[in-house]
């Protein structure tokens, strides 16, 4: 074989049709993996051998699934061959619920590899049975039933990107103090000092997602002064958190009921952190629980 590239990183992407393997391979390509989709298992070992001889290839990701037809059962033999040759690899297995997969196939109008549209559910269940043993060998199992493409990308970035900025994520939650503090927060920010839309009859039943409320909160001189200082603080802190090996910063932003001010500030902070290049997930814990007064 010649000089081997012993540092070659090998990812095998597999799982259920419609679970997001194409999106996964695109994400991995974005972070530097040499990607091959629908590689026949019989060619897999030879491809890895050639990649190990190439100085230009450091990371490979291979999508192998039931589209390989009669060749797919060969995958177990190839994995054994890799292990016998002491070649390390990781398996990423993507799946989703039957209901979600049926919906995705109907929306895309694509044919399932194992059957026609008239027996779609049967085809999905048959594929699930075929992949059960391989699923048990997975190093990273991802259920995409409730994941957006962006959230799937964030999961893969956090695990496989060598860029520390990409591996770091901020989780921002808005909440109402009347309903208790989030228990898993690193930073808790009290924004009850900001102007309160609740006391304007037009905005009382609105939320921080409504344009009128957003403008009311963000156009305040107090808010502008606060957000400038708060974002500067985060800009200062986050690089130090990354340096210490922290991969997630949980930020909780609270107002009285979690309906107006905290929602606006959580969304605004999330957008600003994204502009800085960080992965951000924003959720609003109490936005639907605003029956009590702020």
From Swiss-Prot:
UniProt family annotation: Belongs to the RapZ-like family.
Protein's UniProt keywords contain GTP-binding: yes
Binding annotation for ATP: 15-22
Binding site for GTP: 65-68
Biological role stated in the UniProt entry: Displays ATPase and GTPase activities.
Species this chain originates from: Syntrophomonas wolfei subsp. wolfei (strain DSM 2245B / Goettingen)
Protein name in UniProt: Nucleotide-binding protein Swol_0262
Single GO MF descriptor: GTP binding
């Amino acid at each position: 074989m010649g000089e081997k590239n012993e540092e070659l990183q090998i990812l095998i992407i597999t799982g259920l049709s419609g679970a997001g393997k194409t999106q996964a391979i695109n994400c991995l390509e974005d972070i530097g993996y040499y990607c091959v989709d629908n590689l026949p298992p019989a060619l897999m070992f030879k491809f890895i051998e050639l990649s190990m001889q190439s100085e230009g290839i450091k990371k490979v990701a291979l999508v192998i699934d039931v589209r390989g037809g009669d060749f797919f059962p060969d995958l177990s033999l190839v994995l054994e061959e890799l292990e016998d040759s002491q070649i390390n690899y990781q398996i990423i297995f993507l799946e989703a619920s039957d209901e979600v997969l049926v919906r995705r196939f109907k929306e895309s109008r694509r044919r399932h590899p194992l059957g026609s549209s008239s027996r779609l559910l049967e085809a999905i269940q048959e594929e699930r049975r075929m992949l059960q043993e391989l699923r048990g060998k997975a190093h990273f199992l991802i259920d995409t039933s409730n994941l957006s493409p962006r959230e799937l990308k964030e999961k893969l970035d956090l695990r496989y990107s060598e860029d520390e900025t990409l591996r770091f994520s901020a989780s921002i939650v808005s909440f109402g103090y009347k309903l208790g503090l989030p228990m898993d927060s690193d930073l808790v920010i009290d924004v009850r000092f900001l102007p309160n839309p609740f006391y304007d009859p037009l905005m009382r039943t609105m939320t921080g997602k409504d344009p009128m409320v957003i403008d009311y909160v963000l156009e305040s001189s107090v808010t502008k002064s606060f957000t400038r200082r708060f974002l500067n603080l985060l800009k200062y802190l986050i690089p130090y958190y990354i340096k210490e090996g922290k991969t997630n910063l949980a930020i909780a932003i609270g107002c009285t009921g979690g309906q107006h001010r905290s929602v606006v500030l959580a969304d605004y902070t999330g957008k600003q952190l994204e502009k800085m290049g960080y992965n951000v997930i924003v959720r609003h814990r109490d936005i639907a629980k605003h029956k009590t007064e702020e």
